[in-house]
From Swiss-Prot:
GO CC terms, sorted: cytoplasm
Stretches the record annotates as Linker: 340-545
C-terminal: annotated span: 770-864
Entry protein name: Chaperone protein ClpB
Record region (NBD1): 158-339
Taxonomic lineage of the native organism: Bacteria, Pseudomonadati, Chlamydiota, Chlamydiia, Chlamydiales
Subunit structure: Homohexamer. The oligomerization is ATP-dependent.
Family: Belongs to the ClpA/ClpB family.
Primary gene name: clpB
Annotated region (Repeat 1), positions in chain: 4-69
Length: 864
């Protein structure tokens, strides 16, 4: 028998394997029946399931019959088909012939079983009380005019059920989230669906704005009956592309599956609507070696109006795939779905709040909803509302839920303290001296007291957990009751509606209110079950690295004394330190301009006066590590084409996919200090890029992605006018002001930088040449760093004033600033100490002092 469907052929093969493994000499019709029932995707199984909702009853009867089959002890010869199985297959072949089918399939086998009266099938058949004529009608209804003309034809029946999800059924079962707002878009979708031809809306919008939610909203309205007469009673299916492609082994199998779905939608005469999410994936799908792609299968049905279809795709994909295919584009009516306003996004979150509260078992405050929208809008610019705000609420709620299930911090601390005391007591008990025994007895009292405190805390924890868990269960019950009320109203069961609306629901709501009040009135609660704006800010900070949560007292104090902290590292530059500190304080309390970077500063001055050091010190203070500073040496950007290094190569060039060094650094770490060293050496094209960043806080990279630069601090350093500045300061001494210094360098500045560039800089900060006092302070800072490194080897280093004076005199050169000091300390001090350490002259746990003797550095050990 050569023309058998794939499903029947597979069942026959498995039947032979089953008989062989059970050592049965013959493959009976029961082996075959068992294997047919195991394939839950087969036509045979689907019809059995339609006849009787529980096919397991038949499976159990077949298993019992198989246990009575004879078996042979020796020999493993291949079992032969029994006369009963051969007769059954011949009958099935005749059924296929009668129905005009080319291939024998599962429905033919079922008809043959039905007529054979073989046990245990015959006994099961009596329980279902269905006639042969009714069975044939059911098969015709399932097949919907399809012929078995290929081995896989059987698999393509009921395409809608296999490869689609019924959204209206999910809405009826209450499994969809409520769709708030978007009334205009849903109304427009309904309007297009009501047309006679080309009734296919295409939802186009950015990812996360709510395109899929519009389809779900339509399904909810169909169930509620809030829909025009032309769409009442329709079924909305969403195409599952994964299921459609998965397991399509042979060429043309994917197209067959899609055709079966389209045929099912068309055969019900407009009663089904197909929703294709990410519709652009159909363009090109299945097209190999000149074959048609899946989109071409859609076109005829779309043009005729026999296929009701809703598509959804993003603006970029629509442009890239759909617009290129003019024939496909004109068969859809575009509906643009824009990002909701901040007010609408808050409104949407209010509608979803209850679902998330019930799922996580927490309370979400109004402030949390507002914070989620505002903070996501400001700090997560590369995603869209309401999706990003919903994600914030979801993550914050899951954080609280996780904390409820974990051990509270006070209990954890007490348990650690108790464990440490017990270990210490056990160690003391081993000592024989009476004083130790007394101490062990005293510790026992502390242990008992801690155990009592722990027991009380655990009792409180259990009570709070019980209250919170009970609240979650009651809220779940309330949601189920409200769904039951809606369902009863749909089927006009008004007695049930009245009972739920006026009795059960109000009583449960009152219980929930009482439980919430009882929970709120508890003092010193161990568990937090409220999602507030503080927690939302914490989640945003975790996502972006931008510290927008409320400042701790320690951080506030640190910001107030920022100048003092910076002056410990950068000496003699009060103008720059003061201006930068003010900018950071304004940004940290949220008073800086939200549409511009935190600060844009140009540091002017001769080499070695602390320009780069100040940028490093800022990064260290803000992020606790100097490496957090993103540094660009602008001598690498002197050619016109080098701008592509910053924002990425244009399309078609090597490195296009990698992105630019500046754009990628700011995308990964938006809150950072960006240093452009020696900015005057950069090409003019680089300055044009910086204009956009400094003015709007936005950088557009080579892929047209907008990178947020509003949380970065930009510092540029330059040596422009350093000679004029040095001459002026030498003439005037310490009596210079910032304004007078800038007036000296202004003419030189205008030669290098355009007026529009200078205009976008927040402040131009002159770094004046260092005087003798500054050099002495810098030597002290550098020496303390050497001493710090020695402390790691348990060596204490001190020095007298003569060492500082010698180093400051020998190491300072007004032309080179403080940089030669570092080299001198390396040559004179570090070299001397490293040789002494290698020789063993300096050992661990010693103190040494550096002194001068006839212009020679010496060290001596300090006894004691």
């Amino acid at each position: 028998m050569d023309k058998i469907s794939d499903a029947v052929s597979e069942a026959l093969e498995k039947a032979f394997e089953l008989a062989q493994s059970a050592k049965n000499p013959y493959v009976s019709e029961n082996h075959f029946l068992k294997c047919l029932l195991e394939n839950t995707e087969s036509l045979f199984y689907l019809i059995i399931k339609d006849i009787h909702n529980n096919p397991k009853l038949l499976t159990s009867a077949v298993d019992e019959a198989l246990s009575l089959e004879p078996s042979v002890i020796e020999g493993s010869a291949m079992p032969k088909p029994s006369p009963g199985l051969q007769s059954l297959l011949l009958d099935a072949k005749q059924e296929a012939k009668d129905l005009g089918d080319e291939y024998l399939s599962g429905d033919h086998v079922l008809l043959a079983f039905w007529k054979s009266n073989k046990e245990p099938f015959a006994s099961w058949k009596k329980t279902v009380k269905i006639s042969l004529d009714d069975l044939k009608k059911l098969i015709i209804n399932i097949r919907r005019g399809n012929r078995m003309d290929s081995p896989s034809a059987e698999n393509n029946l009921r395409g809608l059920e296999k490869y689609c999800k019924n959204l209206t059924l999910l809405a009826k079962e209450g499994k969809l989230d409520p769709v708030i707002g978007r009334d205009e878009e849903i109304r427009r979708t309904v309007q297009v669906l009501s047309r006679r031809t080309k009734n296919n809306p295409m939802l186009i919008g950015e990812p996360g704005v709510g395109k899929t939610a519009i389809a779900e909203g339509l399904a909810l309205r169909i169930v509620q009956g809030d829909i025009p007469e032309s769409l009442k009673g329709k079924q909305l299916y969403v195409l599952d592309m994964g299921a459609l492609i998965a397991g399509a082994k042979y060429r043309g199998e994917f197209e067959e599956r899609l055709k079966s779905v389209l045929k099912d939608v068309e055969s019900v005469d407009g009663e089904s609507i197909l929703f294709i999410d990410e519709v652009h994936t159909l363009v090109g799908a299945g097209a190999t070696d000149g074959a048609m792609d899946a989109a071409n299968l859609l076109k005829p049905a779309l043009a005729r109006g026999t296929l009701h279809c809703i598509g959804a795709t993003t603006l970029n994909e629509y442009q890239k795939y759909i617009e290129k295919d003019a024939a496909l584009e004109r068969r859809f009516q575009p509906i643009f779905v824009t990002e909701p306003s901040l007010e609408d996004a808050v409104f949407i979150l209010r509608g979803l709040r209850e679902k998330y509260e019930i799922f996580h078992g927490v309370r979400i405050t109004e402030g949390a909803l507002n914070a989620a929208v505002l903070l996501s809008y400001r700090y997560i610019p590369d995603r869209f509302l309401p999706d990003k705000a919903i994600d914030l609420i979801d993550e914050a709620a899951s954080l609280i839920r996780m904390q409820i299930g974990s051990l509270p911090l006070p209990i954890d601390e007490k348990e650690r303290e108790l464990a440490a005391l017990i270990v210490k007591q056990e160690a003391i008990k081993r000592e024989k001296a009476p004083s130790y025994q007394e101490e062990a007895a005293a510790m026992q009292q502390s242990i008992e007291q801690l155990k009592e405190e722990l027991a009380a805390l655990r009792l409180r924890w259990d009570e709070e957990k019980k209250l919170i868990t009970g609240l979650k269960e009651k809220k779940n019950s309330l949601e189920n009751m409200k769904f039951s009320e809606e369902e009863a109203e749909r089927v006009a069961d008004y007695n049930r509606v009245a009972e739920l609306r006026y009795s059960l629901i109000p009583a449960l709501e009152e219980e929930i209110r009482e439980d919430e009040e009882a929970l709120n009135q508890r003092d010193n609660r161990l568990l937090q079950e409220e999602v507030d704006e503080r927690l939302i800010a914490q989640v945003v900070a975790n996502w972006t690295g931008i510290p927008i949560q409320k400042m701790l007292e320690g951080e506030a104090e640190k910001l107030l004394v920022l100048e003092e902290s910076l002056e410990e590292r950068v000496v003699g530059q009060p103008f720059a330190i003061s201006a930068v500190s003010d900018s950071i304080r304004a940004a940290r309390v949220g008073l800086s301009d939200p549409q511009r970077p935190l600060g844009v500063f140009l540091f002017l001055g001769p080499t070695g006066v602390g320009k780069t050091e100040l940028a490093k010190a800022l990064a260290d203070l803000l992020f606790n590590k100097e490496e957090a500073m993103v540094r660009f040496d602008m001598t690498e950007y002197m050619e016109k084409h080098s701008v592509s290094k910053l924002i990425g190569s244009p399309p078609g060039y090597v490195g296009y996919e990698e992105g630019g060094s500046l754009s990628e650094a700011l995308r990964r770490r938006p809150y950072s200090v960006v240093l452009f060293d020696e900015i005057e050496k950069a090409d003019k094209e680089v300055f044009n890029i910086l204009l956009q960043i400094f003015d709007e806080g936005i950088l557009t990279d080579s892929k047209k992605r907008k990178v947020n630069c509003k949380n970065a601090l930009f510092i540029m350093t330059s040596n422009i006018g350093s000679q004029e500045l040095a001459d002026y300061c030498a003439k005037k001494g310490s009596r210079v002001s910032k304004e007078t210094v800038l007036s000296v360098v202004a003419p030189t500045l205008k030669k290098y930088f355009s007026p529009e560039f200078i205009n976008r800089i927040d402040d131009i900060l002159p770094f004046v040449p260092l005087n003798t006092e500054d050099i002495v302070k810098i030597v002290g800072i550098q020496m303390r760093r050497v001493a710090q490194r020695l402390l790691e080897r348990r060596v204490t280093l001190t020095w007298d004033d003569s060492v500082i004076l010698y180093l400051s005199e020998q190491g300072y050169d007004s032309s080179f600033g403080a940089r030669p000091l570092k080299r001198l300390i390396q040559q004179k001090v570090v070299t001397l100490l490293s040789k002494a350490l290698l020789k063993g002259d300096i050992k661990s746990d010693t103190s040494i002092e550096l002194t001068m003797s006839k212009d020679v550095l010496l060290f001596k050990k300090i006894e004691g």
